[in-house]
From Swiss-Prot:
Superkingdom of this protein's organism: Eukaryota
NACHT domain boundaries: 229-558
Binding site for ATP: G235, R236, A237, G238, V239, G240, K241, T242
Protein name from the UniProt record: NACHT, LRR and PYD domains-containing protein 13
LRR repeats: 725-749, 781-804, 837-864, 894-917, 923-946, 951-978, 1007-1030
Similarity comment text for this entry: Belongs to the NLRP family.
Domain Pyrin: from-to ranges: 1-107
One protein family per Pfam: NACHT
One GO biological process term: regulation of inflammatory response
SUPFAM superfamilies in UniProt: DEATH domain, P-loop containing nucleoside triphosphate hydrolases, RNI-like
Length: 1043
């Protein structure tokens, strides 16, 4: 088993200071934190300043009383922490709290005299460490020494004695505590013995040396002295969360772990207690106590020495979801108050009942979000289950031949979904049980492990093909329907535990249930009398999916809800993107495979309905009637589902109305699913394909040649879509990580004469040399009209790109090189490009340091008679007034340019004045001008107003984010009154007030062309808005959009 820490804030065991810290109000707490600075501590402590550790102020500032107590524990020895708190309280004149702290300090003196750490203490510590080494123990690390100080203030070594030797505390412990340990150990072993583990699974509960060390780290994941008080074990079903928690309990009961930290460990099974009625917390923790009364008062007197293990908390969340929430927000602190169990558990989680106790919680991944709100400073530990090495060990227990094991593992890695599922031991057992059957010799390994559904189907078929079950032949279909109904109803209600009444209601017969127990499909729950669960969640999910494909006595009768439920499931997964139902839907599609259906019918004596596929196709047609069906649902999930079916004809029909696909390929399973489905999207016209991982790169991690070859085969299949699909005209490869082999396949497809791609976008593609190969492949391509290479560091690649695009057969109309690290020198190549061809009409060069010198070169091209450029984007190119002079001169001669974007350049009033020399000509061709964020004022606005009064060809003008003020807009409005062309005006964030609204009112009332006006980010008060609204009501106002 393996686990990893996700996150853990500072937290730990505190020594009783928390109640006093919680008594401080907000302002007192802040003052207390300030007093913890070393310089402040010198005022009431005799030690020099350097004697005190400095607590990082960032930690102090954010700390609440609970975290503050942890910080004190972490940075001060026990005795010193108490004296520091007392000294600060005295400084703050908190007399009452001082008296209480002194009283408790006197009580503590009976067991240990509170004093400063002295040289004698340090010598004793070193001596003890030396004694441990002479006894054959490892040298303790700093964390262990810190724990010694924390536990006793003297010298005791935790975790360094022989694991089989009890600590001194164990030898002297009270009789009732010893009996409790023995009772817990006996119950744990009995529980494990009663679990119907599959063959060879018992070894999983044994603990190796490494796992023993992992258990030691479990309750201190960050290896800090201030240990976390709430640890949450998170993981998928069956990866070992409960097993790990039970191992921790068993080690404590055996006296080899957590001895000094915990006097008592309590196990609360949510399976069991969810059915309990109202009780008290004292009664709840006494359930598993031996024959005599539990020492509740002792528990209450040492709360920091208690560990509560809450196993399977999702059961409580599910129970709450079926009824009104019992957590009404009122705190629960009384151990003897009778309350619903869920209320008690929430109070325990919120640190209301036992604030100083440590909690260890296990929960399935899906439900973590519902748990977080109830926790105080939790630490989440991801339980990952079997590692690759664990899998190899497990498979070697089933297959003696190591070469056969490697062959199986190699094949499993091709199916990433199945391989990842094998982190759960029960799934491993399923795989091994299936592959060991004699029947497998008639099926190659690849077909059995091709999909997760195929493996499970063969597994269950093998179990029942020779099973002797005392059941009439005509009873089998009904029994399978009953089992599948139990599975799906449980998932609808998020129920994974079933009592006897549940199985009786579904009509499951005893012989059939016994066979399910025998084959480890179902399992009895020991701590919940008469309760049953599926041995692994994937079994329940498989049979839940099977409930939708089984033929009913009268197939889809009028009262049947199966078709509606099926569509609801698809809605959950494909539209709402809910992960909870994804495995069920995948199994559902997998069961549509004709070969799998035939196998199940022959061995399970059931009938698969042929109408299910018809219903699914109808649903697909309804969804596809939308204008852009692929935008409504998660297309990659649909691809996963169709790949699971492995039904080519069905897939082709389902994807017949898909016109646009957006794929982000991270894993091998996504690559394989895309390869399977894309070739069937015959009406696809736009493909966005992002390979955002190094999955196509052959490195040391991909040792198996067959796996790499499988990936490249899938990739080349995707590339072939560019050739075989005559409707595919747009390809977007942005944010892709490619490499030599993958680029080769892509280039071959783009060079193919049958490729119909017209628009190619390659933003942020790595590595940059990929673009060189692509542009070489595109050289002479007469179909390509749009090319976007923005957000790439082209550098020296620019001349090569432009040279290729100057090919006589090239028909490019749009070129975007925004944010490509271009410089003024690059403009020389761009100028040559613009004068060499006459079909490029739009050039986007924004976010490049072209500067004034670069624009001068470009403007020389704009005046060339062969330049046909219509749109030029030069936003944020570090231009100034000189650039405007060059542009103005060019505009006076150029007869094609109609759109110019100069936004985010510091042109200022001088630059605008230069532009207006060309803009003011009545025969000017410019129709759209963007000068937003160009740092000019009302003076520049006046120049624009004068120019517009002579030129009525400008239709779009954006002047936003300039300091125009009301006076500037007044001049502009006077020019716009007779203007007959302007339909869009941008004045966002221009420091306008209500004073300008009268002028805007006049324009809105008279203009017959203005339909869009942007005034966002200006301080227009109610009167100004009312004036604008008055204009909108006039019949002469043509405005359609006001921002």
């Amino acid at each position: 088993m393996n686990f990893s820490v996700i996150t853990c804030p500072n937290g730990g065991t505190n020594q009783g200071l928390l109640p006093y810290l919680m008594a401080l109000d907000q302002y007192q707490l802040e003052e207390f934190k300030l007093c913890l600075e070393p310089q402040q501590l010198m005022d009431f402590w005799s030690a020099p300043q350097g004697h005190f550790p400095r607590i990082p102020w960032a930690n102090l500032r954010a700390a609440d009383p609970l975290n503050l107590s942890f910080l004190l524990d972490e940075h001060f020895p026990k005795g010193q922490a108490w004296k520091v708190v007392l000294g600060i309280f005295q400084t703050m004149n908190l007399t009452s709290l001082c008296e209480k702290v002194r009283a408790e300090m006197k009580e503590n003196v009976q067991t240990q005299e509170l004093q400063d750490p002295t040289q004698e203490d340090l010598e004793m510590l070193e001596a003890a460490a030396g004694n441990m080494q002479t006894q054959g123990c490892q040298d303790p690390n700093q964390e262990e020494l810190d724990e010694l100080e924390e536990e006793t203030g003297n010298v005791q070594a935790q975790g360094c004695q022989d694991p089989n030797q009890e600590e001194p505390e164990m030898l002297e412990e009270a009789d009732h505590r010893r009996k409790y340990r023995e009772n817990m150990k006996a119950e744990l072993l009995e529980t494990w013995d009663n679990i119907s583990w599959p063959k060879d699974h018992v070894y999983i509960r044994n603990t190796s040396k490494d796992e023993h060390e992992e258990l030691q780290r479990l309750l201190d994941p960050n290896r800090t002295r201030a240990q976390a008080q709430t640890i949450v074990l998170v993981g998928r079903a069956g990866v070992g969360k409960t097993t790990l928690a039970m191992q921790a309990m068993l080690h404590w009961a055996n006296g080899v772990l957590f001895q000094q930290r915990f006097s008592y460990v309590f196990y609360l099974s949510c399976h069991k207690i969810r059915y309990m009625k109202e009780t008290t917390f004292a009664e709840l923790i006494s359930l598993d106590w031996p024959d005599f009364d539990a020492p509740i008062e002792e528990f209450m007197s040492q709360p920091e020495k208690l560990l509560f293990i809450i196993d399977g908390f999702e059961e409580i969340i599910i129970s709450e979801s079926r009824s009104e929430s019992l957590d009404d927000g009122s705190p629960c602190t009384d151990w003897y108050q009778e309350l619903p169990v869920t209320k008690i558990l929430h109070s325990l989680l919120k640190k209301e009942l036992v604030p100083l106790a440590t909690l260890l919680i296990t929960i399935k991944t899906w439900f973590v979000r519902d748990l977080k709100a109830s926790l105080v400073n939790p630490c989440f530990v991801q339980i990952t289950g079997f590692t690759g090495d664990d899998l190899r060990v497990y498979f070697m227990r089933h297959f003696d031949d190591s070469s056969e094991v490697e062959k199986i593992l190699q094949q499993l890695r091709k199916n990433e979904t199945l391989f990842h599922s094998c982190s759960a031991p029960m799934v491993c057992w399923t795989v091994c049980s299936c592959l060991k059957q004699p029947k497998v010799r008639y099926y190659d390994l690849q077909s059995i492990t091709q999909t997760t559904t195929s493996l499970y189907a063969y597994f269950f078929s093998n179990l029942f093909s020779t099973a002797e079950v005392d059941l009439a032949d005509d009873s089998w279909p009904g029994q399978w329907r009953a089992l599948c109904s139990l599975a799906i109803e449980g998932l609808w209600s998020m129920n994974f535990t079933f009592n006897k009444e549940d199985t009786e209601i579904e009509g499951l017969e005893v012989p059939f249930i016994d066979s399910l127990y025998e084959f480890n499909i179902l399992q009895k729950i020991n701590d919940c009398g008469g309760c049953t669960t599926f041995t692994h969640l994937s079994f329940q999910e498989f049979f839940a999916a099977m409930s939708f494909v089984l033929e009913e006595p009268r197939e889809f009768p009028p009262h049947s809800t199966k078709p509606q439920e099926m569509k609801m499931l698809l809605q959950h997964v494909l539209l709402d993107k809910e992960a909870y139902w994804t495995p069920v839907v995948l199994f559902f599609f997998g069961l549509l495979n004709k070969n799998i259906a035939r196998e199940l019918e022959d061995t399970l004596h059931c009938k698969i309905s042929p109408r299910v596929m018809e219903e699914l196709l109808k649903w697909g047609e309804e969804l596809g009637k939308a204008e852009s069906a692929s935008l409504q649902f998660h297309i990659l999930r649909l691809f996963h589902c169709l790949h699971e079916s492995q039904e080519e004809d069905f897939t082709k029909k389902m994807l017949g109305r898909i016109f646009e696909v957006d794929l982000n390929i991270l894993e091998d399973e996504e690559l394989q699913a895309s390869s399977f489905c894309l070739k069937h999207c015959k009406r696809l016209n736009k493909l966005r394909l992002s390979v955002s991982s190094h999955i196509l790169e052959r490195d040391l991690e991909i040792l198996e040649t067959s796996k790499f070859d499988s990936r490249m085969h899938a990739w080349n299949s995707i590339c072939s879509t560019l050739v075989t699909n005559e409707n595919l005209h747009e390809l977007d490869l942005s944010n892709s990580k490619l490499h030599a082999s993958s680029v080769k396949g892509l280039c071959l497809a783009l060079k193919n004469p049958r490729c119909k791609v017209q628009k190619l976008t390659c933003k942020s593609v790595t590595p940059e040399w990929v673009l060189q190969d692509l542009i070489i492949a595109l050289q002479g391509n007469s179909k390509l009209t749009h090319l976007n290479f923005s957000s790439n560091k082209l550098g020296m690649t620019v001349p090569l790109i432009l040279k290729a695009l100057r090919h006589s057969a090239c028909n490019l109309k749009y070129l975007c090189l925004e944010k490509c690290n271009l410089s003024a020198a690059s403009c020389q190549d761009l100028a040559l490009f613009l004068t060499s061809i006459q079909h490029v009409t739009r050039l986007c060069l924004g976010f490049n340091r072209l500067q004034d010198d670069g624009i001068k070169l470009l403007c020389a091209a704009l005046t060339h008679p062969k330049c046909a450029l219509e749109r030029l984007e030069l936003w944020f190119c570090q231009l100034a007034a000189p650039a405007c002079k060059h542009l103005s001169d060019a505009l006076l001669q150029n007869r094609s340019l109609t759109h110019l974007n100069l936004s985010k350049n510091s042109l200022r009033d001088e630059g605008v004045k230069f532009l207006c020399e060309a803009l003011g000509r009545p025969d000017g061709n410019l129709q759209s001008l963007n000068l937003s964020g160009c740092s000019f004022t009302r003076e520049g606005c006046g120049e624009l107003a004068n120019a517009l009064s002579h030129n009525h060809n400008v239709k779009i003008l954006d002047l936003g984010e300039n300091d125009l003020q009301d006076d500037g807009v007044k001049l502009l409005c006077e020019a716009l009154k007779p203007h007959r062309a302007l339909h869009t005006l941008g004045l966002a964030k221009c420091n306008l007030t209500t004073a300008c609204c009268q002028h805007l009112f006049s324009v809105l009332s008279s203009s017959k062309s203005l339909v869009n006006l942007n005034l966002l980010g200006n301080e227009l008060d109610t009167d100004g808005v009312k004036m604008l609204c008055k204009a909108l009501k006039k019949s002469t106002c043509r405005l359609q959009k006001l921002g």
